[in-house]
Structure formats: C-alpha cells, structure tokens
Amino acid sequence: MKTKYTIREIETEKEMFSIFPLLIQLNPTLKKPDYKIMLKDMLRHGYRMVGVFHGKQCVGLSGFWISTKIYSGKYVELDNVVIDTKFRSKGIGKLLCDWIHAEAKRLGCKTAMLDAYEENKRGHKFYLREGYILRGFHFLKRL
C-alpha cells in the first residue's frame, strides 16, 4: 500500500516555528532564538515555506524565495530542503521540488536555483537527478 502524503504551504510564523525539530536535522547548530529572529527577517523579505505531511507530521519542508538576478532573470531559490531522516528516499524531495517549480512557473520564474552544503552528497545526487546543473561556486565570508 502506497503511503499518502499531503503537500501544502506553511503560512503562519507559528507553524514555521513549530517545524524547528525537522529543520535542525539539516542545521544541527541552529538555536531556537536565532531561528525566530531570522524567520521574522526572512518573512519581511518574501520568504515562503512548503511542507509535506504524513498525517499531521511534517516529514519534509523547503523554504523558497522569488527574486531576480541579471544572469538568471526571475527565479525561485529553494532554501533549506529538509526531509526527515525516517522518510528519506520515499519521493518526498521530488514532491517538494515539483510543487515549488509549479508555483515558480505560475509566478513567471524562468529558473530554479539552490545551494547544497558541500558535505551533502545525497542531496547533490538528488538535485542532479532532478535536472539541476552545477553552475558555479557559492562563497561565504563571515563578517
């Protein structure tokens, strides 16, 4: 019997904060107070979030932004795609990406992009399988 999942946008700050235990599976050093501050700031800049649910449990999520860059035109950026460790390799990542890509197309985006941590080899394989290409390097400098 195939497991049934539902996918929907997570729209309230309260619900976005409630998924913190799932979010730290990808970002284990993130602290709740810091997340709360960052989330408020991100929401002011157009941040949105979508989740995949097994019953009432959020088992996968991704944030995303819509913006425009000179080299890409209007684009969607996937941010912190996280699948619960107990639910990986069950098609949840594809559900998230397909939903976000459809929403981005609806909003006139021509490109999807994302960053994946260098050590996230499984994620790299997944994104390549989904048609993403390696386009460059993402540099980070702490200020």
Segments from the language model and where they lie:
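A short helix-loop-beta-strand connector motif used in the catalytic cores of GNAT acetyltransferases and
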Residues: K40-G51, E77
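Conserved active-site alpha-helix within GNAT-family acetyltransferase domains
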Residues: K94, R106, E118-G136, K141
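A conserved beta-turn-beta hairpin within the catalytic core of GNAT-like acetyltransferases
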Residues: S67-L78, R88, L134-R135
